[in-house]
């Protein structure tokens, strides 16, 4: 053989596949990206958003506070109004009762005044009767006034009423009221059963007794009920 290759002893390693050449792996350097700072416009926008959010939350809080305050005021006013209404309704019976008591007390005072006056009158008349020994009489002027009052009540009498007086009063009554009695159709008569100063009127409807004895009994009855 005419090859010019040098001769080399064969070994078993010659059958193994050739080993690859070791090449170190170089990892790529990490790219560090620095975060860029926000621009002025972004900062302003962020501030606006924060201000808007704060204003929104503040508005909600203020609205809640105002609503709570208004509700409290309305509730207080309603409570006061209801309390006043209940107080008035509770005081109404008490007020009515007090008015009734005042009215009854005034009626009692009026009645007491009347009783005192009647008792004083009864005592005075009784004292006069004890002194003079008979029922005190009134003068003719009182009798004339009494008859004039009876004449004013003429519509109460029909027909020809008859006026009776004590004989001692007959002449004076005739002189003072004779013409008036005749004008009204009244007849004047003397009645010795009457006390001086008293009179009676007799008509179709009945008698009207204004005698001194009758008035005396009435005064005593008012002064001491149940005694006379």
Swiss-Prot record:
Annotated compartments: Cytoplasm
MF (Gene Ontology): cytoskeletal motor activity
Major localisation: cytoplasm
UniProt KW keywords: Bacterial flagellum biogenesis, Bacterial flagellum protein export, Cytoplasm, Protein transport, Transport
Pfam families documented for this protein: FliH (PF02108)
GO cellular component: bacterial-type flagellum; bacterial-type flagellum secretion apparatus; cytosol; type III protein secretion system complex
Matches recorded under NCBIfam families: PRK05687.1-1
Role description: Needed for flagellar regrowth and assembly.
Protein name: Flagellar assembly protein FliH
Organism: Escherichia coli (strain K12)
């Amino acid at each position: 053989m005419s090859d010019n290759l040098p001769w080399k002893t064969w070994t078993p390693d010659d059958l193994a596949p050739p080993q690859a050449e070791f090449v170190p792996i170089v990892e790529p350097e990490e790219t560090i990206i620095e975060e860029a700072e926000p621009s002025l416009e972004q900062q302003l926008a962020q501030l606006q958003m924060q201000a808007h959010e704060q204003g929104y939350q503040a508005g909600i809080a203020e609205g809640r506070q105002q609503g709570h305050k208004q509700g409290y005021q309305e509730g207080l006013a309603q409570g006061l109004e209801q309390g006043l209404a209940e107080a008035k309704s509770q005081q109404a019976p008490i007020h009515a009762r007090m008015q009734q008591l005042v009215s009854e007390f005034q009626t009692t005072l009026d009645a007491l005044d009347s009783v005192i006056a009647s008792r004083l009158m009864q005592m005075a008349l009784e004292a006069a009767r004890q002194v003079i020994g008979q029922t005190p009489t009134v003068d003719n002027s009182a009798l004339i006034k009494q008859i004039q009052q009876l004449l004013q009540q003429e519509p109460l009498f029909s027909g020809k009423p008859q006026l009776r007086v004590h004989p001692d009063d007959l002449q004076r009554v005739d002189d003072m009221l004779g013409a008036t009695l005749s004008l009204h159709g009244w007849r004047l008569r003397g009645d010795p059963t009457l006390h001086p100063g008293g009179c009676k009127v007799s008509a179709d409807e009945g008698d009207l007794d204004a005698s001194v004895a009758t008035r005396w009994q009435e005064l005593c009855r008012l002064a001491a009920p149940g005694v006379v």
